[in-house]
Amino acid sequence: MKWQKKGLLTTMLVGIALMGVACGNKSNSSSNNSNKTSEYDYVYATDPDNFDYTVTSRATNSTHLVNFVNGLLENDKYGRLVGAMAKSWDVSKDGKTYTYHLRNNINWVDSEGNPYAKVTAQDFVTGLKHAVDAKSETLYVVQNSIVGLSDYASGKTKDFSKVGVKALNSKTVQYTLLKPESYWNSKMTYGVMYPVNAKFLKSQGKNFGNATTNGILYNGPFILSNFTSKSVIEYKKNENYWDKKHVYLNDVKLTYNDGSNPDGLYKSFIKGDYTQARVYPTSADYKNVVKQSKNNITWSDQDSSNYGFVFNLNRQSYTATSKKTTKAKEDTKKAILNRDFRLAIRFGFNKSAYNAQSTGDAGAARSLRNELTPPSFVQVDGKDYGDAVAQDLAQSDPAAFSGVNLADAQDGTFDAAKAKQYMAKAKKALQAQGVSFPIHLDLPADQKAALTLNKAKSFKSTVEKNLGKDNVIIDIQLLSEDKYLAATYQATTAAASDYDLSNASGWSPDFDDPSSYLEIYNPNSGSNLMNLGLDVGTSKTAGDAAAKKSINMSEYGELLAKADAITNDNNARYAAYAKAEAWLLNSGIQITVNSLGGTPSVSRVVPYSGPYAQSGLFTSGDSRQGSTSFKGVKIQAKPVTIAQQNKARKAWLAKRAEIAKQEESSNN
């Protein structure tokens, strides 16, 4: 999607409610649930803090907002883009003009469910203008797509009428693009393109988008009925929703969970309090889970997200650190700017052992990922995109990457011998610069989140073992949840990113193109540059300029620009992006570890009943299928069985394959 900032999702969301798993428990083990087929109950891990859906990029907000507000299009259960507010649309022959025709009688309602106004074409114009005026964190999704939008956003023009979005009448909205984008419609599921009612916006002023029940209007399947910080979030069905016949839940209740008692999820499921529950093979109580539910524990599929580690290339904040001297800080910074040092960390990191902390050995490899963009996200001349990346990566540095396997569900980069080799090279070069060893790397961790803390400890263990404590020491910084988030996931500037390396954040694509992954590190506009400790565009500090020069970020920017310029040949476009991705992997500035999914759960959610998406606001690590939306989701009286899950998955995959074949035929 999105940042997860959403498109970012944090690895803290261990038990997030919106990961509705298509799996279950023994049919006789949670009889208290039998009457709760119209209510979904589970947990959430982090409070939402912004309901301005045109602005926020954080998954902790968008996972809720996708249930409250609809845009022009949405994803159905098979991943197809279908009409939401729009009933139909037209595309010009040159691929630059998209015209959407709205449904009749679609309503905005207030937090009590009372009709407020009709949704009109002008609301989409208002929404985009507000996104710019409110300095949207997600404007990058469309800023360089729509005619005149970049000029308006930069202040070159103050006349919004010159921007390529027009309400042709109350039911017709039209967008004019700078160049053709085959993936344009997939951007319609993103919040920056959602409508805003001008009257309500004006009445709310600065309070618009507050994380309260009355901070926004609703035109989606649910209405927020209650939000009490670090306590509970509750939705109720929107009875004025245009497609309410496909909303099968009357209520959604999410209870705050700080992650300190993972075993409690299953126990609450058994008691009938929760609709589903993650289960943890590494837990001492897991044997009881298996005893009670062995025929119902199923594993979710990988989604399109990725999580991993990023190096802070220009650290400026040192609130959470074990370093005592200025020299220690400078030595670490020099080490991080050394490519061989970064590659040594990557090769010395056992991702399977890390992942096993939450899934056990049986699930250790299930969600592993080795590149930023999933290997099968798009096709290049009939082959997976990942194949092209692997070929380009091997050619860029045969000694380091020849034979490296980038496929999902296996650790393609762990190589202890190679790690020692690259550490020796790095140490020789760094000692010549006066750097003292061992290098200390600060890694923040939430002190109460037991599972993610165990992952941090695993990272420390394997890296120090394979590289030697005389070379590298990982200093885990135990922080409160609020301080942890402030230093990592919620840091909005490079200067606020307080770590040497971090595993706090992840990413899901905003739209169906590799650029949605790779542009996050664009040196001129990248929305994730702050995670690397870097400024967007012109450097604000000498350290920033030196860091960008050290890793040759300008070359990466040039590769992205070359790929983006190709608009009439998707094979050539994707091949060009594969070269950019190979550059990113070669640089070692980030380490992709895993996606969401690949986890065991028990559940009463009917398998594959909800929407599926690989990009946009509808994505998350949802093992129902990859959606945060509860539209279409069904709950059954008895827990889902393994046999039911497998049968549903087989049918769902077959239908997806049939649809893909039909789409390929129509495109030809």
Task: Give residue ranges: language-model regions.
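Surface-exposed binding/hinge segments that line
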Residues: D123, D133-F200
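Gly/Pro-rich hinge or "lid" segments in bacterial periplasmic/extracellular proteins
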Residues: F160, K171, L177-T255, G264, ...
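Extracellular/periplasmic solute-recognition and catalytic clefts
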Residues: S225-N240, T255-K324, S352, A356-D361
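Detector for C-terminal structural segments
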Residues: R346-L393, L451-S461, T492-N668
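Aromatic- and charge-enriched surface segment that lines or borders ligand/interaction sites
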Residues: K87-V141, D331-L337, R342
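Ligand/substrate-recognition segments at binding pockets and active sites
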Residues: G363, A399-P509, S595, R656-A657, ...
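Alpha-helical secondary-structure segments
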Residues: Q122-F124, Q174, N250-D251, S305-D387, ...
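N-terminal lobe/hinge region of extracytoplasmic solute-binding protein
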Residues: V43-K93
